[in-house]
Curated annotation (Swiss-Prot):
Belongs to the UPF0145 family. It comes from Natronomonas pharaonis (strain ATCC 35678 / DSM 2160 / CIP 103997 / JCM 8858 / NBRC 14720 / NCIMB 2260 / Gabara) (Halobacterium pharaonis). Coiled coil: none annotated. Gene3D superfamilies: Hypothetical protein apc22750. Chain B. HAMAP family: UPF0145. This is UPF0145 protein NP_2600A. Pfam families: YbjQ_1.
Amino acid sequence: MQTVSTETVPGHETVEALGIARGNTVEARNVGRDITQSIRNITGGELKAYSELLSKARDEALSRMEADAEEMGADAVVNVRLETSKVTDGGSEVIAYGTAVRLR
């Protein structure tokens, strides 16, 4: 499955748009991790635990989007976008979406 942020897949012709493929996940922070990250927030520097959490969430959302596109019979997903939103005080949603297409 090819996924690109552009309107087309280089070297391929889009023959059919199948619809919007999407995948999302909601990840919650860990209370113990929150304490250590709060200290890091005071002293400065990267909040690695949160960076890793969001990176994992992005990967999962993209994987679920690809699975959705495969169920539609797509060869690729174009115009891929990622968005995040706060769902609760301790959790964030990451959604990946794009247009599922068939290629020639």
